Amino acid sequence: MNYLNIFRSSPRIRAGLPFDDFDDSGLPLLDVSHSHSLPRAMKRPIATADFLCQQSRSRPFWRILLCVAFGVLFGTFALAPSGLFHTSASFAARHAVDELYARQSTTLAQAAARYTLRTGRAPPPRYDRWFGFAREKKCLIDEYDRIHRDFKVWYQLAVHAPTHFQEMIARATRQLDGLAADISGVEILNGSVSITGSTAYDDNWPRTISRFSQHLPDMTFLINGRDEPRIAFNYRALGAREAALAPKDSTPFMHAPRPTVEFFAQQSGCNVPAQATGIMESVNGDSGFLLASAKPGYTTDLYPMLSMSKISPCFADILFPTEYYYDRSWWAPHFSHPDNIPWEAKKDLAYWRGMSTGGMIIGSNYHHFARFRLVDISRSRPDLVDAKITLFAETLCAEGCDRTAVMAEYNITESRREPREDLYRYKHAIDVDGTTFSGRFLGLLRSGSLVLKSTVFEEYFNDWLRPFEHFVPVLPDLSDLAEKIQWANEHPEEARLIQQRGLEVARRVVTDDQNDCYFFAVLVEWAQLLEYTKIAGTN
């Protein structure tokens, strides 16, 4: 790395200014191999030691001092290349986030124009209030393509049937009356939030929504309280418009096959590819959710419902931020103290600890679940992976499940659980699906370790946290996990850059305020679709 060249073009060095007037803030320690991501002002080479020391006999005494100091400094840098790269990786990561915020709209007119360009329609009536809230909270303004994708089908249907959105909400409410389906109905009336339902989050959601409910019109919406998505409807299939407008599921949200493998095999769009490109290879046999979902309860009609995760195009749920990703929430996994171990002192291993979740254990199907497979890899490659199941999920042991045998096979002793902060001792952290999404992703990104993530699920932040840029993706069957860890160990600078980028986005972008802005934006779209019913009623 040519760190010296960065110094050479400093105007003060070229002008021969006195040392006391020299500002060393112009000397960032940068890895020029990543200079494409740096500001133009930082893409400058530095003076060599020869340049600094030449003709020192005829120069003022300060040049001799500078020459000596520079030699000592350069020698120190040469002995600590990892520290230098950490500085440049941190800078590049910070700069990428700075650029993200710099390109956001700064006026309502600009934001509205970009919204229209992306969606083909004018912003919803309450968009100005959302914009003011987002600016106050320093949120992203233009980066909500995930929301636009989730709602597009409903806007398409509204062209032909403007009251259909409201009708399906009413239909769901009637169907759910008296059923323990883990679905809550939320009502906003004059800015106050009330909730009816039977989910674990009914005490949390009203507090979250109340942070912005005063800006929303009176409305009702539905939230799925299960980790699993619920709307098993492929709106990308031929004939989807007609099927959506003619619902026929007589028991919505009550389809609960055990196991679920045959149900998904027969559902349109639910044969999930292991990779986005290349020859089609199904992941259905490698996902605990698709094999034997822990708590199924689906509908095969298209209903509007907010959910924490989904698989596209198998499911058509509308994504929103789960409480697991609010730092202020009890549900969020917290570390008791920040990372206090230098990167160089961390082990070149990938770390994971967790429960035996993944799907309902029926016979020996658990061998295909990601968490059990991860422990198998750890046993065969202890030089790369340190993974253990620390707690057995009793509720997922169904008929045909031999609890004692499973615990013995995977040495699940349920002894004292290891502190979450043990992760700090490892350079790499593994994130794998449990019942659905793990809920750990943001915490792992903030931990100081490089995250290797394997999942079949989509979440609301997927457009902001991208594979190969902020984390290292791993196939659902974990067949490339060892290869990816080896790559990280053999390319420490590139791995460190990915780690720093993920850390920076998780800390600065996906914050509680940003989650509120996302949730608020979702409900602004929901309110717009409800407004179509009112407009149709007045015409």
Sequence positions of predicted segments:
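Secretory-pathway glycan-assembly enzymes, especially type II membrane glycosyltransferases
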Residues: R59-R63, C67-T76, S82-I412, R417-P419, ...
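Short linear sequence motifs
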Residues: R12, R44, L108, S336, ...
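Polar/charged alpha-helical tracts
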Residues: Q54, A170, D339, E490-E493, ...
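N-terminal signal-anchor transmembrane helix specifying type II single-pass membrane topology
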Residues: N2-F85
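Catalytic binding pocket for nucleotide-activated donors in carbohydrate/polymer assembly enzymes
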Residues: R417-N539
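Broad hydrophobic/π-residue packing in well-ordered secondary structure
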Residues: S35-H36, R40, I46-L52, A112-Y115, ...
